[in-house]
Amino acid sequence: MARYYNIFTQVQLQTAPEMGVPLPPGDEERYRLTGYNYWFGKLGQAQIGPIYLGWLGVASLLFGFLAIEIIGLNMLASVNWSPIAFVREFFWLSLDPPGPEWGFSPFVPLAQGGWWILAGFFLTLSILLWWVRSYRRAKSLGMGLHVCWAFASAIWLYLVIGFIRPFLMGSWSESVPFGIFPHLDWTNNFSLIHGNLFYNPFHALSIAFLYGSALLFAMHGATILAVSRYGGEREIEQITDRGTASERAGLFWRWTMGFNATMESIHRWAWWFAVLTTLTGGIGILLSGTVVENWYLWAQQHQYAPGG
C-alpha cells in the first residue's frame, strides 16, 4: 500500500552510511566522518559526510580563515578591543579600502588600507581555490559543470566590484568596504554618484533576472510540493512510472498560463536566470564610471528617461 510522506510525516531510516561512488585513482580518500542528524533529516538528507577536502579544500579554508581573522581583528581594534562594543556595533563596523591618495598601489601601510588589501587577497584566493575544487570534484564524479559556472558568475561580480573596476579606475578607494551596513552605504553612494543605477540597463536586467529567479523558484517549489502526494518529488519514479503527478502539474500550468515547463527545462530556466543575475550585474557595475559617468544623463540622451 502506498503511503504519502511529507516534511511532517516522513520516517527517517538510519543505516550504514552511504560513502558515495568510488574515487578515481590518485585521489585522496574521503574523510570517514559520518553521522546522522535528526533536524538535518527534517530539512533534507539526514546523513552527514563523508567529507572530501583534499589540499585545495584545506588551502581554501585556511586562506578564508586568514581573511576573516584580519577583518574581525581590525573591527575589534576599531572599538578599542571591547567585546561588548564589538557585538553591539557589529553591523556598523567596517574594514575600509585605501584612500584615493594611494591610487591602485599594492604597497599601502597596513593602518591606511593595507589590511583591507591583505584581507581581500586572502579572501579572493580562498574563493578561487574553492572554485577549482568544485570543478575538480564535478569532473571526478562525472557530473556536468553547471554548478561551477554558476559559481563563476557570482565570482565575476565579486571581482568586478573588488578588483577589476578599481583597477580600471586607478584607485582602491572605488572598491567596497568589508562590513554589513558600510557595504549597503557603499551601494547607495555608488548609485548616487553615477546618476541612479535604476537607469543602468544592465542593472535593470540584473534585477529582472533576480526577481525572475525568485518567481521560478517559488513556482517550481510550489508545484512539486503540490503534487508530492502523488510522488511528484521522486524523480526516478516520475521517469519510469509517471503516474499522475507530472500530468497534474503540467495540466495546472497549461490551465493557468497556457503552457508548462518540463521536469528538465524548469531547472534550465532557473539556472540561466540565476547566472544572468550576477553576470549582468557585474557588467552594469563595470561600465559605471569607466564608460558611463552618469546613468540618468545617459538615459536621457538615449530616450530611456524623461527629459531626453
Language-model segment annotations:
Residues 33-44, 79-103, 122-148, 218-266:
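Cytoplasmic membrane-interface regions of multi-pass membrane proteins
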Residues 41-63, 135-156, 204, 264-275:
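Alpha-helical transmembrane segments and their helix-start/interface "positive-inside/aromatic belt" motifs
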Residues 75-106, 163-198, 236-255, 294-308:
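Membrane-interfacial helical/loop segments at transmembrane boundaries in membrane proteins
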